[in-house]
Regions:
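Sec-dependent N-terminal signal peptides
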Residues: 2-13
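Eukaryotic helix-grip
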Residues: 17-195
């Protein structure tokens, strides 16, 4: 299996792997967004992107969890939708991801779990590949984790941290290298522009 970063940026701030081969390394800083990378012992490439948005935490949260509109601002998403909302802290979403020829389009089905307090919101997505039947039109991404952490700095300033990895078959490593940094930069820049 080759690693490919998840185009979803939703998502991210705490580590997903117990054992790490390397620590985070800053790879790019642009538009007040920092993107860090690291590899785990099982050779997954993870990214962590951080920025400050001058808006209250709850407004940013509402924008992020509007998964029916995520495709409008997230990198390479062709479509996005909420499949099932169990309650305010658990629901299921599906994303379809545009891939350049000759690669086949991907889709991802994830659960979304939300934890909140007055100064902190965590939005975690974990792949749930069997939640709905897969389509022949897409190759399903079966292993991914993403997390978005919103941390209140003050009433009008929020730190946003996105962390993610995904594993998909058949993606050459040079493609991974082209997009793993640009994806979170694109998505966080678009998110910031909404405020």
């Amino acid at each position: 299996m080759l690693n490919f970063f998840l185009i979803l940026n939703l998502v991210f701030c705490s580590g997903f792997s117990d054992s790490l081969e390397t620590n985070w390394k800053l790879k790019k800083e642009e538009n007040n967004i920092k993107v860090f990378l690291r590899k785990t012992l099982d050779h997954r490439q993870e990214y962590l992107a951080e920025t400050i948005i001058h808006r209250d935490m709850n407004s940013i949260y509402e924008e992020i969890i509007d998964y029916n509109s995520s495709y409008k601002w997230m990198y390479k998403l062709e479509s996005s939708k909420i499949l099932d909302k169990k309650n305010d802290s658990l629901f299921y979403v599906q994303f379809t991801i545009e891939m350049s020829w000759p690669l086949k389009k991907r889709d991802l089905v994830s659960d979304v779990k939300i934890k909140k307090n007055k100064d902190f919101i965590s939005i975690s997505l974990v792949s749930s590949p069997d939640y709905i039947k897969s389509s022949d039109d897409f190759i399903r991404i079966k292993d991914s984790k993403s997390k978005c952490v919103l941390s209140k700095i003050d009433n009008e300033t929020t730190k946003v941290s996105l962390q993610s990895y995904a594993v998909i078959d058949g993606i050459p490593s040079f493609i991974v290298d082209m997009f793993i940094v640009e994806g979170p930069l694109f998505s966080l820049s678009n998110l910031k522009s909404k405020f």
